Design a protein with these regions (language model features):
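Flexible, glycine/threonine-enriched loop-and-boundary segments that flank and lead into catalytic domains
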Residues: 52-54, 306-337, 394-430, 545, ...
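Conserved oxyanion/phosphate-binding beta-strand-loop segments in alpha/beta enzyme cores
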Residues: 2-10, 15-70, 100-109, 133-139, ...
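Conserved active-site neighborhood of enzyme catalytic/cofactor-binding cores
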Residues: 65, 74-110, 268, 369-379, ...
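Nucleotide/phosphate-binding sheet-loop regions of phosphoryl- and nucleotidyl-transfer enzymes
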Residues: 275-277, 284-288, 292, 347-382, ...
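Catalytic alpha/beta core of large soluble enzyme barrels
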Residues: 92-93, 105, 358, 362-471, ...
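Residue patterns forming the tRNA-binding/recognition surfaces of aminoacyl-tRNA synthetases
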Residues: 2-27, 32-33, 37-41, 126-336, ...
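N-terminal catalytic cores of NTP/NDP-binding nucleotidyl/phosphoryl-transfer enzymes
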Residues: 52-134, 158-169, 338-341, 345, ...
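Single conserved hydrophobic/aromatic residue that forms the stacking wall/gate
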Residues: 629-643
Length: 643
């Protein structure tokens, strides 16, 4: 007699246990019996409108109400599930069963977010190939989920490493890459702004309907530009584009990390390695183009107001102006664009600051200008030495450390000067790590009379402070309470010290004195646009999404490069581009403290896969997409019409 049979027999007369005691073994028998019945009858099967996927009664969808229940996919980066997984799955299972009992056609399926750093790191730690460990972990997780009795339609289970899923991930990337955001496009709802094919943008350039950036005054037509020039221009419009971006470089892991993968201490979440800020060539998604739409669409969702407010603040829409300053260098005048929410304070700008990653720092002079205070130089003999050392120091800090309000304000003079387009004043140009390259333009105009951070910086380096706003008369406050002690920080007040008889850009008179702040902003924005040195614009705290990694375990980009380095999109017929099985899949790692090291993608060592001969060109891209891209279309791939 088996142990199970023994536990289901009546207890003997001398036993203290009740007959047919409900214990773990009996529970397992009952669960196993009903799970087999559910499997045999297809109790949890969802029916498609047509095709082979029918419900347990052999029916296609027949007009019954449809209900879609979705769970967050587990990462198969460990041998099995942990206790946190069923916490969410049980809740969605209760909801699914409720709607199924109401007679609805319920689609409730499970999948596995199988690419990415966690799965690859697990494989490295266990000394196996990621595909081997991932498939083994998926099999065990599937067994565990089934054993829990959750009402999934297992016929529809998939993993993000499946070729069919990879194909659609790459197809989605192709559509994003081949699109641009047309702010003037009219949507069916009457609103403006929509993604349009890049071919339409090219047609606008060819017809002259849209000016070609950088060629507004030289008369060049689109056909006059070579292919590389055309692609550089289109790259500035594509929704998926190549950028030189400040990134979290982790030499110890040999890869770039997302902000979420970096701890508050500036270490990698995996392995606890130091993380440095580096500027590298990366793939980015132009999500900032959708900033305003994201805010507007929050009104249409049934979320708590507190959560929606957090989202609005995270997107961070602000209205201001972009302003162009001229910077004189040995290589000629260079443009420095800044974004400010307070263009009315342009008269109070006494210095400017750029990020350590800013391109202008490639043009610093060989020697210090005359009469530069010693504390501006940071102890260095030349601007070149000073900038190089400061850049290295900035790389060792996280973005969070750099913008910490309580931290010490560091910086040094670059040897360059920027010209104020209104007053013509020569503003010393500093570099400071509290200015981030991927926020705004990586350059700021400093107004110490109206900003605490600028005031602290000005005091430290002995820079002048000009107040351009005074309190309203009815406020009971007085500017004398601030002068020489602190900035007057207020969006409202009366503008002062803001008049010039002849502007630097136009030679006309301009005065903002006596105006309220909002009126002064409107007036100066109009002047900036008329002078061709700026315009009113909108900026976002939200940043474009960097989504490439120098790892092996992920989908390759469907991009090849020509001999001239020009990227070409592979046709849909070539998809999916699958990962080759390689013996050496680990990225090259470096000394964890080697901030100057450069990433080496594992696939770059696979010459047979990297080099291809096509009419498009040769040299397949060796970066791959991060896990977040293949996770972000899970909903669509599981919808009934897509199954």
């Amino acid at each position: 007699m088996s142990d199970n049979e023994k536990t289901t027999q009546p207890a003997s007369t001398d036993s203290t246990e009740p007959a047919y005691r409900y214990n773990a073994a009996l529970a397992q028998d009952i669960e196993g019996k009903w799970q087999k019945i559910w499997d045999d009858k297809g109790t949890f099967w969802a029916a498609n409108v047509n095709g082979d996927l029918k419900d347990g009664k052999g029916r296609n969808a027949d007009g019954r109400p449809a209900y879609f229940a979705m769970d967050m996919f587990p990462y198969p980066s460990g041998k099995g599930l942990h206790v946190g997984h069923p916490l969410g799955y049980l809740a969605s299972d209760v909801v699914s069963r409720y709607h199924r009992m109401k007679g609805e056609n319920v689609l409730h399926a499970m999948g596995y977010d199988a690419f990415g750093l966690p799965a690859e790191q697990y494989a490295v730690q266990t000394g196996q190939h990621p595909r081997v460990t991932t498939l083994a972990n998926i099999a065990n997780m599937s067994r565990q989920l089934h054993r829990m009795g959750l009402s999934f339609d297992d016929r529809r289970s998939f993993a993000t490493i499946d070729p069919g899923y990879v194909r659609w991930t790459q197809w989605i990337f192709s559509r994003i890459y081949d699109s641009w955001y047309d702010e003037d496009a009219v949507n069916p709802s009457g609103s403006k702004g929509s993604a349009r094919p890049v071919s339409e943008l090219v047609a606008k350039f060819e017809s002259g309907e849209k000016a070609i950036p950088g060629h507004e005054s030289d008369g060049k037509a689109w056909a006059d530009l070579d292919q590389a020039e055309q692609q550089d221009i289109l790259n500035d419009f594509r929704l998926a584009y190549i950028s030189k971006s400040p990134v979290n470089w982790c030499p110890g892991l040999g890869t770039v990390l997302a902000n979420e993968e970096v701890t508050a201490e500036g270490k990698s979440e995996r392995g606890n390695f130091p993380v440095f800020q580096r500027e590298l060539r990366q793939w980015s998604m132009r999500i900032t183009k959708y900033g305003h739409r994201l805010i507007e669409d929050l009104d249409g969702i049934d979320w708590p107001e507190k959560v929606k407010l957090m989202q609005r603040n995270w997107i961070g829409e602000s209205h201001g102006a972009s302003v162009h300053f001229t910077v004189a260098t040995a290589d000629g005048s260079k443009d420095m664009e800044i974004y400010t929410t307070r263009p009315d304070t342009l008269f109070g700008t006494t210095f400017a600051v750029v990020s350590p990653e800013h391109h202008l720092l490639e043009n610093v002079p060989a020697e210090w200008p005359a009469d530069v205070p010693e504390d501006w130089k940071g102890g260095y003999a030349t601007p070149v030495e000073a900038v190089k050392a400061y850049r290295l120091a900035a790389e060792a800090k996280t973005a969070k450390d750099r913008v910490d309000e309580g931290g010490e304000k560091t910086g040094l003079f670059t040897g360059l000067y920027a010209t104020n387009p209104i007053t013509g004043a020569k503003l010393p140009l500093f570099t400071a790590d509290y200015v981030l390259m991927d926020y705004g333009t990586g350059a700021i105009m400093a107004v110490p009379g109206g900003d605490q951070r600028d005031y602290d910086f000005a005091v430290k380096f002995g820079l002048p402070v000009i107040y351009t706003v005074k309190p309203l008369p009815e406020s009971g406050d007085d500017l004398a309470n601030y002068e020489g002690k602190a900035p007057f920080v207020s969006h409202d007040g009366i503008v002062i010290n803001s008049s010039v008889e002849a502007t630097a850009a136009k030679g006309d008179a301009l005065s903002l004195n006596g105006l309220r702040v909002d009126d002064a902003i409107a007036k100066v924005n109009a002047w900036l646009e008329s002078a061709g040195v700026g315009k009113g614009t909108v900026s976002y705290r939200l940043r474009d999404w960097l989504f490439s990694r120098q790892r092996y375990w992920g989908e390759p980009f469907p991009i090849v490069y020509g001999e001239d380095g020009t990227p070409h999109l592979l046709p849909d017929s070539a998809l999916p581009i699958s990962l080759p099985d390689v013996p050496d899949y680990e990225p090259r790692t470096f000394d964890p403290m080697d901030a100057e090291s450069n990433p080496e993608a594992p696939l770059s060592r696979n010459e047979d896969w990297v080099k291809v001969e096509l009419d498009l060109g040769d040299g397949k891209k060796t970066d791959r997409k991060s896990t977040r891209l293949n996770s972000s279309h899970i909903t669509r791939s599981r919808m009934p019409s897509s199954a």
